[in-house]
Amino acid sequence: MYHFVSEQTPELRLSAEALVTSRVTQYLKSFQLDAVRFVYDRLAKREFCILNDESGLGKVATVAALLSALPPAKKTLVVLQNDEQLLTGWRFHLDTLTDLQVYIIQGVHDTTDSPHSVYLAKWSQLRSIGDLSRLKFDYIMVDNRGHSLNNSFCTSMLLKQFEGRVNVLISSVDITSDVKLLYNVLRLGDRLEHQYKSFSRFDRKFHLPDPKEVFSKRIDLEEYYKQRGFLSEYIKDFRLRRFRHQFDKTLPLVAPEQYKHNLNLWLASKNSQSTLSGSEVCSTVASIENNPPQQNETVLVEESDRISEHSVDDVVAMSPLIFESSESDDEPITVDPVANENPVLVVSSDDCEIVTPPNTPPNRTPLVNKSPRTKSKKKCSKKPSPCKEADLTDSEKDDEGLTMPPRKSTRAATVHFTPKTRRLNVRLLRVSLDALSTPTPSGATTAIITPKTEPSARRKNRTKQPMDVGRPATRGMQRLTRSAESKINSKYLKHHVLDDAKRNFPRRIKAEGNQTPKTSKRIVKQESKAKAKPEQKKKIKTVDKPAQETPKRKPGRPRKCKTLTETLGKSKTKPNSKPLPPTPQVLSGSSLSSEYMQCAQRIPDDLDAIESPAFRVPFTPQQTPMLLTLPSTHNLLNDSEVVAIPLFKDQVETVVINSSHDESSPQDPSQSRRTKALKRKRKPDAPVNSSFGGGLGLPQAKRSATNKSPDLFSISSDLSQIPLAQPRPSSPFEGFKIFGSEVKQFQQQHAKVTIPAPKKKRDRSCLDILEQMFEPRLQQSSKTSPKVLPTLPLIQKDDATTTFTQRRGTLLEDDFFEITNNGQFGSRMRLNASGEVSPVQQDQQSVRPTQANKITNYLIGSVITQERTQPSNGNRNSIVASLRKSPKSPKHGARTTQATKLTRWFGSVFGGGASQTSSVESVSAPSTPVNPSTSAAACQTRTARSGGATGPTKRKRLELFK
């Protein structure tokens, strides 16, 4: 009785008419006999019941024992998932445990008039038949072990044909884990109460949250299982649910090797009468062999239900949720053999391990005695090794040969061709499969000469090789070539492969560029070369092949290296790509100037040979050089992806002064160039709303009317500088860009420079009171001023934008530039056209007004909108002269000391006499449009008021609005 272990058990009397004989009960455990009683009690009353035992507890054997106790005249339909493996399992157990006649429904012409007792049918076959009214069954059972009820087509077909007529549902998954599944099951068994006929009412009563929410711990597990308990209580009278850990002493019921061996024996004995073809038998056994955890079930071929048995030995209360999440039934079985990247090589390596000689003699010996068809096949094969190929067609034999030959040369092929095969498409993989199979009949190499004799010779050699039923690759091969299985086995495709072989043999040394014949032909050569060593008996016929192969294999290896070095994207070319990591120095600003890297210029290959000049990189904080010299592995870029296109687009927009509004924050050293490029894409619209945002290192969103950064550059021909007003401490100066090189200044270092200044100001109570009294009101006025009419600051922004566009062209023409107001380099620094930066000693005359007027410059800058552009020296002199001639200045002889400027600002804020230039008064400006010349004059007036390069002078107030 195959793998079933006999125990001295008495027969099981279910009723006066039903008896499970001791011939059956001796192979069942006590808990399986309990399940037989449970199901029969409901079945005798024509009631619906659910056999919901966990996977591995022998549900199919239980049902088979139950069916053996029923009268043979009763006809039972078992609806299965669309899986040959499940179908074979049912046939195996019914044939082994019972004497019932089993019929498989396959088409429209099948009827129930035949003298069979059990009818097995896949739900897809029943759905294709359509009208099932002519099929009369006494009992209907649904096997949900393949999650068939999760398929809406299967559920709709069952509800349409068998609603209220199903007697037994077999399921390994806890059906209380899904409310919709339970609702459909109760509809099939006619167990729904009247108030729950509609699913909305049923769901309102027994609603369960989504399992995803449970897994993410957004829902209390105690409440979840409390609700699951309500469902279990609702169906407890007609459901049987038990777990594996309750019967640990008796599990596993069968060893996986023993089960596989006996299933092979049964398949071999039934092969001549089986409705399964040879390839389907092989695929069934191969799928069983590929999943060894699934064979722990004894009398039950629930291979698909057994994947999750390692996770179900936990607590009883937790097991239903775990089953639903981790229990995969039949679908993943077809996925597992093809899970690899390289299916051709995996197939051959699996054949190496699994097709072993010890398995073949027990499979062959009963075959010689039992099957006369196999004996006749053996006579024609000219080799004394019989095999179970009784029903194989020619195409199936060719399919066998595709995976069997590479057994002996798998390792050599794997070493040389794994990167190549990865690059081939499916069609090339199929061509290499045919090439793999061509040299294997080394005993009949003459057949390769003519294409006509090749398929017949191959068919002769197919029968010579012992076919093991436990080969795991057939399902994977069907998965690989599902759309063109017939093309692989057709002789026409083989003809083309042979023609290519004839054509490319002399051409291999000349044309080394084509890769398609190279890959397939090299596999052919290594196949035959490796075959020539173990097969010494047939060495006479194949002795001329290695002489041709040796010169042809040698140029193949360096050519493979050449093609690999041409494509730098592969992972095995890392030694060649090591010179490339310095390329971030070109793309990130301050390493090289624009002389080495223009916009959209190709990156030079010898970047390491280019030595950067001495003063190319200024004295900067430590984090910036670390960022520039990061290896390319820290960037999220491959070696072939060094050039970041968005960065080049950003450089094209600002040729001279690179836009740094998106780099105002301190650089994170782990930030990649791709991230920076993406950031530049996100924020290019910010300079539209601001004035002169391109050349400053301040974030545009934080600027207000009282929080403006000074201009960094002066484009005047004269190199003398105007001392600038200090920015607010809330907006630190964080960097500037010249010629594409950037100098970063971080928050900590700027805080050391600028934080003591607010403390000095806060010590004076007068300034503190002034800021608290007037600054909120002034900020409101500056914010609401654009709503009334375009005022001076807005016009000034337009002018600043135009001057910025002009500045791009003129900046490259000058030789020397001086940059002021930088805490790291002193107040002035000089930059020549080659990019060298040098500090400049300042004369005392220009330092003194800056030192004396720091506080007043801050106050003036906070009240009046700070200027963005500095006027030239000639314009400044004319403005000062016009100020002196103005008759309306209230104070003629006042020095621009600290007290004078403070009192002047105080008087202008309080609106005494001459307050028209304040930003408060600008709200009530006349409604006539102001021309740009007036705004330029106002800008220059405020620029001169903040202190000139010639020191403090006497000024008169200029009235703009009379």
Swiss-Prot record:
<feature type="compositionally biased region" description="Polar residues">
    <location>
        <begin position="866"/>
        <end position="880"/>
    </location>
</feature>
<dbReference type="GO" id="GO:0043596">
    <property type="term" value="C:nuclear replication fork"/>
</dbReference>
<feature type="region of interest" description="Disordered">
    <location>
        <begin position="353"/>
        <end position="413"/>
    </location>
</feature>
<keyword id="KW-0156">Chromatin regulator</keyword>
<dbReference type="GO" id="GO:0003682">
    <property type="term" value="F:chromatin binding"/>
</dbReference>
<keyword id="KW-0158">Chromosome</keyword>
<feature type="compositionally biased region" description="Basic residues">
    <location>
        <begin position="885"/>
        <end position="894"/>
    </location>
</feature>
<keyword id="KW-0539">Nucleus</keyword>
<dbReference type="GO" id="GO:0015616">
    <property type="term" value="F:DNA translocase activity"/>
</dbReference>
<dbReference type="GO" id="GO:0007131">
    <property type="term" value="P:reciprocal meiotic recombination"/>
</dbReference>
<dbReference type="GO" id="GO:0005700">
    <property type="term" value="C:polytene chromosome"/>
</dbReference>
<feature type="region of interest" description="Disordered">
    <location>
        <begin position="916"/>
        <end position="962"/>
    </location>
</feature>
<feature type="region of interest" description="Disordered">
    <location>
        <begin position="658"/>
        <end position="712"/>
    </location>
</feature>
<feature type="compositionally biased region" description="Polar residues">
    <location>
        <begin position="703"/>
        <end position="712"/>
    </location>
</feature>
<dbReference type="InterPro" id="IPR050496">
    <property type="entry name" value="SNF2_RAD54_helicase_repair"/>
</dbReference>
<dbReference type="GO" id="GO:0031507">
    <property type="term" value="P:heterochromatin formation"/>
</dbReference>
<feature type="compositionally biased region" description="Basic and acidic residues">
    <location>
        <begin position="524"/>
        <end position="552"/>
    </location>
</feature>
<feature type="compositionally biased region" description="Basic residues">
    <location>
        <begin position="673"/>
        <end position="683"/>
    </location>
</feature>
<dbReference type="Pfam" id="PF00176">
    <property type="entry name" value="SNF2-rel_dom"/>
</dbReference>
<dbReference type="GO" id="GO:0045185">
    <property type="term" value="P:maintenance of protein location"/>
</dbReference>
<feature type="compositionally biased region" description="Polar residues">
    <location>
        <begin position="916"/>
        <end position="944"/>
    </location>
</feature>
<feature type="compositionally biased region" description="Polar residues">
    <location>
        <begin position="564"/>
        <end position="576"/>
    </location>
</feature>
<dbReference type="GO" id="GO:0042023">
    <property type="term" value="P:DNA endoreduplication"/>
</dbReference>
<comment type="function">
    <text>Required for underreplication of DNA, which is found in many late replicating euchromatic regions of salivary gland polytene chromosomes. Controls chromatin organization in polytene chromosomes.</text>
</comment>
<feature type="compositionally biased region" description="Polar residues">
    <location>
        <begin position="480"/>
        <end position="489"/>
    </location>
</feature>
<feature type="compositionally biased region" description="Basic residues">
    <location>
        <begin position="372"/>
        <end position="382"/>
    </location>
</feature>
<dbReference type="GO" id="GO:0034502">
    <property type="term" value="P:protein localization to chromosome"/>
</dbReference>
<dbReference type="GO" id="GO:2000104">
    <property type="term" value="P:negative regulation of DNA-templated DNA replication"/>
</dbReference>
<feature type="compositionally biased region" description="Polar residues">
    <location>
        <begin position="438"/>
        <end position="448"/>
    </location>
</feature>
<dbReference type="InterPro" id="IPR038718">
    <property type="entry name" value="SNF2-like_sf"/>
</dbReference>
<dbReference type="GO" id="GO:0032877">
    <property type="term" value="P:positive regulation of DNA endoreduplication"/>
</dbReference>
<feature type="region of interest" description="Disordered">
    <location>
        <begin position="866"/>
        <end position="900"/>
    </location>
</feature>
<feature type="region of interest" description="Disordered">
    <location>
        <begin position="438"/>
        <end position="590"/>
    </location>
</feature>
<dbReference type="GO" id="GO:0000724">
    <property type="term" value="P:double-strand break repair via homologous recombination"/>
</dbReference>
<dbReference type="GO" id="GO:0051276">
    <property type="term" value="P:chromosome organization"/>
</dbReference>
<protein>
    <recommendedName>
        <fullName>Protein suppressor of underreplication</fullName>
    </recommendedName>
</protein>
<feature type="compositionally biased region" description="Basic and acidic residues">
    <location>
        <begin position="386"/>
        <end position="395"/>
    </location>
</feature>
<dbReference type="InterPro" id="IPR000330">
    <property type="entry name" value="SNF2_N"/>
</dbReference>
<dbReference type="GO" id="GO:0005721">
    <property type="term" value="C:pericentric heterochromatin"/>
</dbReference>
<feature type="compositionally biased region" description="Basic residues">
    <location>
        <begin position="953"/>
        <end position="962"/>
    </location>
</feature>
<keyword id="KW-0217">Developmental protein</keyword>
<dbReference type="InterPro" id="IPR027417">
    <property type="entry name" value="P-loop_NTPase"/>
</dbReference>
